[in-house]
Amino acid sequence: MASIIDFCVCLRRPSKEGFDIVIGNPPYIDSETMTNVMSKLREQYSQIFTCAKGNWDMFVVFVEMGINLCWSGGIYSFILPNKLIAAKYTSKLREKIVINDIIEIRDYSRLPVFINAAVYPCTIVGHKTLSKNCNNSSRFIVMRTVKEIERENSTLQEIIGSEYWDVFFRSEIEFSIIKKFLAHKTILSDKWNVIGSATVAEAYELKKVLYDAKNGSSSLKVINTGTIDPYKSLWGIKSMQYIKGKYQYPRVSQSDLMTISKRRYNQAMSNKIIVAGMSSRIEAVYDDGETLGGKSTTIIMGDDLRFLLGLLNSKLVSFSINILYNSIKMAGGYLNIGTREIENIPIPIASPIVQHSIESLVDGILEKIYENTQMDSSNLENEIDGLVYSLYGLSEDEIKIVESN
């Protein structure tokens, strides 16, 4: 990085105060590697670069430097991990990019561009300017091969913010669905309390006192991502993997949990929704104070939880989340669903009649599951989906797209 700065100084371009074009392929060094191998350098960069926030990777500061090296009117182009498009730690970088003009972003994530690197790449071409023209359009391109385009969308820059770039790569009808989904300005965290279930330290403390027992007085069941299905806890049905341990009936005593964290104890003893953390769709289950959400789950507390449970487990919400965060999916299409993804779900205004209808249907599902965990509740879930489609204002053609996914 220092040699690049020295090179810029040596060229001495006072008339333009920068380069006409900056092109680069930054090193793909992730935050964990930097912390372990170059912690002092990472700390220095965090103080120098405004975009180096959160668990940032090395490419973030390279792009910021590249934009800074351009004169006002210069062009920059980079090949990058597609984490640029939606990762939380690239939000500051996206803010910097949208201040200027985005000429195009190409998504190569489905192609083996780098044979020996586990990276899903994209390319970006941008124009540094002090007078952004919001009437200009940006191109968002999905590549079929390295040379062949599968789909190209043109989007006015005035509607491009610093979040949700994934949607600009989608088809016109998918874009319309997401536009309706995001049109509701109340988000989930405005009405409910969203909490990460455990810190790393708490997770390891829990491991020390976790035990296996089908029955246990003054204790709590424990579930995690692998033992949660939509509406259904798989406790006692499916074994739980937890930090190199395996439990069929995982429990923790109330006193042990109180010792680890009084706050976690109070959360566990409360009515709540527990959401799985790693899944291809949202999987949320209701709990009335009998269960502790283990490592990697998210907890939601507040009123009207049965109404919210119906929304979260609906096809439309999972469809939308999968599009909005497509570029940060892992192998197999799995998405790390945490507090950020949950908090920002738009919540439509429901009339008392519609809300009561959803709550009644959710009650019906929960009653069926209580009687028999294997009982089919798809007819009730489909009725909830129909009400959710209406709340978000989807057309029949848009509903078909969601249902087909």
Task: Give each language-model segment a name.
Residues A2-D212, Y286-T297, L305, G333-I342:
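Signature of N6-adenine DNA methyltransferases within the class I
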Residues I4, M38, T90, I102, ...:
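Alpha-helix initiation and N-capping motif
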Residues C10, V22-N25, I29, Q44, ...:
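Generic, well-ordered alpha-helical scaffold segments in large soluble proteins
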Residues I23, S162-A203, S218-V222, G226, ...:
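Non-catalytic DNA-recognition/assembly elements of restriction-modification systems
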Residues K88, F307, H356-I358:
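Residues that form or flank phosphate/diphosphate-binding pockets in enzymes
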Residues S131-N133, P230-L234, S395-E398:
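Short helix-capping/linker segments at secondary-structure and domain boundaries
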Residues S137-K147, I237-Y242, G289-E290, K315, ...:
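Short intrinsically disordered coil segments
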